[in-house]
Amino acid sequence: MAVRIRMKKMGRTHRPFFRVCAVDQRNPRDGRVIEELGTYDPMCPETDARTTLKADRVDYWIGVGAQPSDKVAVLIKKYGTDGSHLEAQKAAVERLGRRKDYTPPPEAPAPKAAPVAEAPAEEAPAEEPAAEASTDDAPAAEATTE
């Protein structure tokens, strides 16, 4: 059985996401995998934070004779055990992990709430005289029919 280390496509339309997997060479791209070795997210804003690899497992599979695909070979070279971009990757992951400071919304919406509270109070008395007028008309109509 010839094993390859290649990417399995996940995600959705216009939002790709890949898993780096050890796969039998004869299986289709998104078919059954032997082991998942990491991820690759091309949509991540930080270039060096796009890839996560289990370096020890990648080394194991390469040691047993697995052949990486071209793109995976580049990722292993950069982010593998002795990768050239490991320090940049750690810094990028830290930048992504930080939460943005919370800024409270401006105070402008508060004055708008006060006039809204007065408006329903004005409408309520306007409805009451209309109800009284209808009750006054009813007895007058009965008196004329008699």
UniProtKB/Swiss-Prot annotation:
Name assigned to this protein:
Small ribosomal subunit protein bS16
Keywords linked to the UniProt accession: Ribonucleoprotein, Ribosomal protein
What species does this protein belong to? Rhodopirellula baltica (strain DSM 10527 / NCIMB 13988 / SH1)
Regions of compositional bias (Acidic residues) in chain numbering? 120-130
Q: Where is the composition biased (Basic and acidic residues)?
A: 84-102
Which parts of the sequence are annotated with region: Disordered? 84-146
GO MF, any single term: structural constituent of ribosome
Might you report a single GO cellular component term?
small ribosomal subunit
Family membership: Belongs to the bacterial ribosomal protein bS16 family.
GO BP term (any one): translation
InterPro entries hit by this protein: Ribosomal_bS16, Ribosomal_bS16_dom_sf
- Which residue pairs form cystines in this protein? none
Q: Where is the composition biased (Low complexity)?
A: 110-119, 131-146
Listed Gene3D superfamilies: 3.30.1320.10
| Alphabetical list of HAMAP family matching this protein | Ribosomal_bS16
